[in-house]
């Protein structure tokens, strides 16, 4: 029946999404009591690693054949950061797989289950011998495409930043408070 296939599709899609729980520990927050971007970034990378490992594409497995993952781009957009001691979770899924790159997305979810931010990333698998990109579709007979998920991620894809001039237009000494208000 159609209803049964819809339930199967939802379950199948849900199995493609990894959910990982965290707590904003006191040593992971800034003086405002909010999680720092560096710690959030570390959690995002760990979630990508856990998710890939659980599906047979983790660093340890790739290293056996002298391959590794390299992060090419990362864009993060947040409405708010978790506070000290707050529980939060991160979901991750693969949006697309191309021959040389894969798109991995993330949702940051607060303790009430509300999505408070998203991230998009672009990854390449490279040969540790040649340092050149490897063909993702040749890995495990292309089975990585079985994990592609159509979960929405409502932020723009990260694009390459083009530098218009080689000459700096200004100099700025950045201080912590300057960066908070960007």
Each model region followed by its residue ranges:
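Active-site helix/loop of acyl-thioester processing domains in fatty-acid/polyketide metabolism
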Residues: 38-64, 177-179
């Amino acid at each position: 029946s159609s209803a049964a296939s819809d339930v199967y599709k939802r379950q199948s899609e849900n199995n493609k999404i990894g959910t990982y729980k965290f707590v904003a520990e006191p040593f992971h927050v800034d003086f405002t009591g909010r999680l720092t971007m560096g710690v959030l970034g570390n959690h995002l990378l760990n979630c990508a690693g856990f998710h890939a490992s659980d599906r047979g594409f983790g660093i340890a497995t790739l290293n056996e054949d002298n391959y590794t993952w390299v992060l090419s781009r990362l864009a993060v957009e947040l409405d708010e950061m978790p506070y000290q001691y707050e529980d939060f979770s991160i979901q991750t899924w693969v949006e697309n797989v191309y021959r040389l790159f894969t798109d991995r997305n993330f949702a940051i979810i607060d303790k009430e289950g509300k999505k408070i931010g998203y991230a998009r990333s672009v990854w390449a698998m490279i040969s540790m011998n040649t340092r050149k990109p490897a063909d993702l579709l040749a890995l495990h007979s292309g089975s990585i495409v079985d994990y592609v998920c159509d979960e929405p991620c409502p932020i723009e894809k990260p694009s390459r930043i083009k530098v218009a001039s080689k000459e700096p237009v200004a100099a700025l000494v950045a201080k912590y408070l300057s960066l908070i208000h960007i």
